[in-house]
Every structure is written in C-alpha cells, then in structure tokens.
Amino acid sequence: MIQMQTNLDVADNSGARRVQCIKVLGGSHRRYAHIGDIIKVTVKEAIPRGKVKKGDVLTAVVVRTRKGVRRSDGSSIRFDNNAAVLLNANKQPIGTRIFGPVTRELRVNNMKIVSLAPEVL
C-alpha cells in the first residue's frame, strides 16, 4: 500500500535511485496505491548523467510492495521493498531495463514492463 510521502526504490535504469510518492492517481480522494497502480512521484535521489534528475516530477507504476498482492487462488506474494518504474508522458517506461521481479498483475495494462522484467511471479 503506497500513499503520499512514501519513498520507493526505482526498478529501472532511468537514472533515479529513490522517488517519493506525491499523489495517488485514479480518484479524487484515493488514499492507497497497490501493484499496477499509477502514481505521481518526485525524484529524491539520482545518479549523475541519468535520464532524469533530482527534483523531476514524473508518473510511475508500482511494481513491488511490502504489503504484496493476494491472488484469487488464495496465495499471496510479498516483496522486501516498495518499488516503481518511471513512465514518460505516453505511459511508456523511461528506462530500457527492469531490475528485480514483477507480478503477473501488471500484464493487464503494462505489458512492456512485464516483457522487460527478468522474472514474473
């Protein structure tokens, strides 16, 4: 569950290392974002010569949460960190590589991220 002020790791090679959620998109008073949801983030930590720099405001999709996700068969998957992938204005990933596993729930709206990921759970 990601809410405003939550710090997330960045799971791609866009140049950002840590981002902070500043808005959960998808409703006027929506409080939490889960895996697959779109959020507005600001870059808090970035590497030199990356595609993004500190202070940039971008959209991102949540790919891993510590809360995890429950499946219809009763199983649940949790991760050790909260992570997001940064998106451009066309809702396509800024980076060309994805680090770490992602869940099958991303297949519905983010097939590009699933195809770049090294492991899909």
From Swiss-Prot:
PROSITE patterns: RIBOSOMAL_L14. InterPro entries: Ribosomal_uL14, Ribosomal_uL14_bac-type, Ribosomal_uL14_CS, Ribosomal_uL14_sf. One of its GO terms (biological process) is translation. NCBIfam families: rplN_bact. This is Large ribosomal subunit protein uL14. GO terms for molecular function: large ribosomal subunit rRNA binding; structural constituent of ribosome. Pfam families: Ribosomal_L14. Binds to 23S rRNA. Forms part of two intersubunit bridges in the 70S ribosome. GO terms for cellular component: cytosolic large ribosomal subunit. It comes from the Bacteria. Keywords: Ribonucleoprotein, Ribosomal protein, RNA-binding, rRNA-binding. Belongs to the universal ribosomal protein uL14 family. Coiled coil: none annotated. Part of the 50S ribosomal subunit. Forms a cluster with proteins L3 and L19. In the 70S ribosome, L14 and L19 interact and together make contacts with the 16S rRNA in bridges B5 and B8.
